[in-house]
From Swiss-Prot:
Gene name of the encoded protein: trmD
Keyword 4Fe-4S part of the UniProt annotation: no
SUPFAM superfamilies reported in the protein's UniProt record: alpha/beta knot (SSF75217)
Described purpose of this protein according to its UniProt entry: Specifically methylates guanosine-37 in various tRNAs.
Protein name in the entry: tRNA (guanine-N(1)-)-methyltransferase
Pfam families listed in its UniProt record: tRNA_m1G_MT
UniProt-listed Enzyme Commission number(s): 2.1.1.228
């Protein structure tokens, strides 16, 4: 998959792109990331990318021309999505990440800055995406999260496929508690069932822990899971 990141601050991506699973995926050419600075597409001597909003207001807006020209300079793959990182967008979740990795070969990710972008930029994008209901100084950090989440779902990035299918959110539940050696650390003991070797009992314990943790911390996920089950039963005519 190809990622084209339109950002005023390309240097801030360097450490992220060269470390961990993402760095390995790029080294193996499972994915490729290209950084594009809209400032390189300005036509004035000051290379200005922002201006005051019409009608007045606080702060500056990113101008449309450099963003449009930057995106139009990119190669176009058949299955391309142009994403604006915006607090007004669809919140990133596992379902969205799976949709993107399944349906697209190229993601163009535009990182806003200042007080946002000129509204006409929305005529260029095909989707707005958000990291959550809070404001950051720019779209770079949300873009990093999006790229990381998508790349790890590309086959070949994660060594064990079961690591993806068994992890939190894939089943609609939070993850169960996990432990490693030592079995007793400062009086904090690993639950006996995990040391029993009884795989059926371990599986049952883990499922119960998932239900309990999700009920305590994210009851909304349980509601969605139940609604999905009811919808499936309805579709089946039961």
């Amino acid at each position: 998959m190809r990622f084209d990141i339109v950002t005023l601050f390309p240097d801030c991506f360097n450490s992220v792109l060269n470390s961990g699973l993402l760095g390995k995926a790029l080294a193996k050419q499972i994915a490729e990331v290209h950084l594009v600075n809209p400032r390189d597409f300005t036509t004035d001597k000051h290379r200005k990318v922002d201006d005051e909003p019409y009608g007045g207001g606080v702060g500056m807006l990113m101008k449309p021309e450099p963003i449009f020209t930057a995106v139009e300079s990119l190669p176009v793959l058949p299955r391309r999505e142009i994403i604006l990182m915006s607090p007004q967008g669809q919140t990133i979740n596992q379902s969205l990440l799976k949709e993107l990795v399944t349906n697209y070969d190229q993601l163009v990710v535009i990182c806003g800055h200042y007080e946002g972008v000129d509204e006409r930029v929305l005529h260029l994008v095909t989707r707005e995406v958000s990291l959550g209901d809070f404001i950051l100084t720019g779209g770079e950090i949300p873009a990093m999260a999006l790229i990381n989440g998508v790349v790890r779902l590309i086959p070949g990035t994660v060594a064990k496929t079961e690591s993806l299918t068994a992890e939190s959110f894939e089943e609609g539940l939070l993850d169960y508690p996990q432990y490693t050696r030592p079995a007793n650390f400062r009086g904090l003991k690993v639950p006996d069932v995990l040391l029993s070797g009884n795989h059926a009992a371990i599986a049952q314990w883990r499922y119960e822990q998932q239900i309990q943790k999700t009920r305590d911390r994210r009851p909304d996920l349980l509601e969605k899971l139940e609604q999905g089950k009811q919808g499936s039963r309805g579709a089946g005519g039961e």
